Structure formats: structure tokens, C-alpha cells
Regions:
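Polybasic, glycine- and aromatic-enriched phosphate-binding surface used to engage nucleic acids
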Residues: 95-98, 102-330, 334, 340
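Short linear loop/turn motifs
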Residues: 327-328, 373-381
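Signature of N6-adenine DNA methyltransferases within the class I
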Residues: 1-136, 257
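Non-globular, low-complexity intrinsically disordered regions
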Residues: 313, 372, 381-388
Length: 388
């Protein structure tokens, strides 16, 4: 998407982007359609930084709008009315939004609050090391079923998915086989459980008939080896539905490839985990998750791990006093102890409203609460418009 936008803007001035906020336009599609109105430009001339681009969201189903000509005129005239919501941003403003990390799919919302709030944020990659579960290619070997008899030192807890997690705390729901010892070492140690496990796969082939001893080979690794570098403290989904959240492990755990792990860097190991959990699950963090993803179809949200690692931000807690940190964790405590709710219900809960107001007040941006909430809801509803 980023490469496409960069390329098209070299040859065209994008003037208007239109998306449906109420139902899909084509019955044979499971995604919401977006179209661009653009004017050809001379690629050798500088881009006018003050030129505005309009981002229009249709408020009604296109099948229910009887006067399409009037609608078209409203879009071209950048007029906000009962049928279309319009946000206008200059090229310079968009460049600033991109620097902050919010991509084009976020510009259908009102982002007039974003520049001021961004001064209070910190890149999460300064605090966390991001990890992904390893894709080793043969789950029966690397994720043993119960009764395997492998020695405990080669077994690590693993979270396969977050479907069984109803709150913000999660625990491993499976086991992973992680052995970096050679066959000779295992024989010397008489670790027969691991040896028998490895040998039970030695003569097996993968789906294409290639022996596992060849298909699973990696540089500087045994064919049966899986690294444990991606143990995580917190975990985010790659695919979100109606609940936007980042969970924390009761005990650090290994993660499956379908999730994004966040491991605290050494200098932040002593930081209060509940404080970090609160910041990762604020309405502001939910906005970033929603704006970073793209609709995969039928309302599902896909996150690109590279984008998430590069641009995900939280409020910068480093200059807060101990009293301010305590006030945040106290306000967050009721949320952390209950089940999560679908977003539209979640943000209306009394404990959620209290937490967000306490949090934003401490950071001096409480006046933006309603705008942040409205922006999040606007993008969320666009994603689910395909189901309308």
C-alpha cells in the first residue's frame, strides 16, 4: 500500500478518496470498496504541500441514495452532509501523519487532535523487543501432543492463539519442543525422551514427499531445532475482530506464528507490568491498532507485523511521578480484572470512561478524549460496514 501510494502520487495528484461506511457496493465482494479521484500531474514538478485531499465516508448504503448526482456534487465540493462525512487534509498534514505512523486508512476520521497528542507518545520499539512465533513447518514435531515423555528441559510453554483469552491476562495453552543439543549430546546425557521423539520423525516426509531431515534444515540449526528467542511478556493478535487489545502473560511464554510478541528490553524489566498493560490497552492504543490494520474481509482486521513494530506507540510514561503511575494503575484495575467486551460496548463502560479520563488528564490531553473516541469508532465502523 505504501509503495502504491508513493508511486501513484508521482504521476497523479490524488484529490478525493471515497469509502463506504454503510455496506459493501458489490455483492460478490467481502471487502469494502474504496475509489480514488486523481488528476494527472507532471512528475518533474514539485508537489504542492498546501494542496488538500478529501477523504469521504458514505453514511448511507449506496442503494438507498436516490440522488446520486447530488451525492457526487457533495463529494466534489467536499461538502459534509447527511449522506457523506468529509475530512480534508493538506499534503503537508498527511506527511506529518505518516511520520507519526498513521496510514491513509486512518484519514477518514477526524485527526485534528493527533499532532498535539503525538508529542506525548513514545515508540514501543524503544521499550519492547518485538518477536514473532517461528514457522518451522511441521507442527506435530514442534508442538507435541500430551503423553510425549520428552524431558522437561526441552519443553517450553506456548500460546497457540488468543481465542480462549477472555480478559487481558493469558496463559500458555500448549507445549513446544525446543532442543538445541546434538544427537550425540542427548545420547551422552541419556535423554531418551527427546531422542525417541526426534527419531520418531527421522524417516517421515512432508506433504510434498521431501524428508523432514531435509525440509526442516535451517542455517546453523539442527533439523529438529526451534529457537526460544521469542519468549514474550505481552502479546498482540495478527487478526483482530470486535475486541482490540494486547494481553499480558501470567508467566512469560513462547508464541505461535499467528501472534506478535512484545518482550521488555533489559532497561525496562523493573517497570510496573500493570502500568504497561494499561497504556497498551488505552483508547489511544486501540486507535493505532485499528488504523494500522486493513480489512481482510467480512470485518476482520489484519495487522502487518513490520508496520506494528515500526510505528506502534503508547503514551510516554518515563517522566511520570510514582503518584501519577499509581493513579493510572488504580483506575485500570477494574478493567484488568474483568472480561473484555466488543469495542462499541467496551468504550461505554463506566470503568473504561473513568480510566481514560484519568489517563489523559495526567498527560494533559483530556480535552481530546471525545475526538479520539470518535475517530476510533469511525474507523471501526468502516471496517464492519461490509456486514451491513
Amino acid at each position: 500500500g505504501e509503495i502504491f501510494l508513493e508511486l501513484i502520487q508521482k504521476f497523479y495528484d490524488i484529490e478525493t478518496v471515497v469509502i463506504s461506511g454503510k455496506g459493501k457496493w458489490f455483492d460478490n465482494a467481502d471487502v469494502v470498496t474504496t475509489f480514488l479521484i486523481a488528476r494527472k500531474r507532471n512528475p518533474n514538478t514539485p508537489i504542492n504541500q498546501n494542496r488538500t485531499i478529501s477523504f469521504c465516508t458514505l453514511k448511507e448504503s449506496i442503494n438507498e441514495i436516490t440522488d446520486v448526482k447530488q451525492l457526487s456534487e457533495n463529494i466534489l465540493l467536499e461538502t459534509d452532509n447527511q449522506f457523506v462525512a468529509v475530512q480534508n487534509y493538506s499534503v503537508n498534514e498527511i506527511t506529518n501523519f505518516e511520520t507519526i505512523g498513521v496510514p491513509w486508512c486512518g484519514y477518514f476520521a477526524n485527526l485534528n487532535w493527533l499532532t498535539e497528542v503525538s508529542e506525548k507518545l513514545i515508540d514501543c520499539n524503544q521499550i519492547f523487543k518485538f518477536t514473532r512465533g517461528e514457522r518451522r513447518g511441521w507442527n506435530p514435531l514442534f508442538y507435541p501432543a500430551s503423553g510425549h515423555n520428552i524431558e522437561a528441559e526441552y519443553i517450553r510453554p506456548v500460546l497457540k492463539n488468543l481465542r480462549g483469552t477472555s480478559g487481558l491476562y493469558c496463559s500458555a495453552d500448549g507445549e513446544a519442543f525446543c532442543c538445541s543439543r546434538s544427537i550425540e549430546e542427548l545420547e551422552q546425557l541419556n535423554h531418551t525422551g527427546a531422542l525417541q521423539w526426534i527419531r520418531s520423525f527421522e524417516n517421515q516426509n512432508n506433504e510434498t514427499g521431501v524428508p523432514l531431515t531435509q525440509s526442516l534444515l535451517r542455517a546453523n540449526m539442527f533439523w529438529y531445532e526451534m529457537k526460544t528467542d521469542n519468549m514474550a511478556d505481552f502479546v498482540a493478535n495478527v487478526n483482530y475482530d470486535k475486541s482490540l487489545f494486547i494481553a499480558t502473560f501470567v508467566n512469560r511464554s513462547f508464541i505461535d506464528q499467528r501472534m506478535i510478541g512484545l518482550s521488555l528490553k533489559a532497561e525496562f524489566q523493573t517497570e510496573d507490568r500493570v502500568l504497561l498493560l494499561a497504556l497498551l490497552n488505552s483508547i489511544l492504543s486501540m486507535f493505532f491498532i485499528e488504523s494500522f490494520g486493513f480489512g481482510r474481509g467480512l470485518g476482520a482486521l489484519d495487522l502487518r507485523a513490520t508496520k506494528f513494530e515500526r510505528d506502534f506507540k503508547i503514551l510516554d510514561f518515563q517522566s511520570l511521578s510514582d503518584g501519577q503511575k499509581q493513579a493510572i494503575t488504580d483506575a485500570f484495575q477494574p478493567i484488568s480484572q474483568r472480561n473484555r467486551l466488543p469495542l462499541e460496548q467496551e468504550i461505554e463502560q463506566a470503568d473504561r470512561t473513568n480510566f481514560e479520563r484519568v489517563l489523559l488528564e495526567i498527560f494533559g490531553i483530556a480535552e481530546h478524549y471525545d475526538a479520539i473516541k470518535a475517530s476510533l469508532l469511525h474507523l471501526y465502523k468502516i471496517r464492519f460496514a461490509v456486514k451491513d
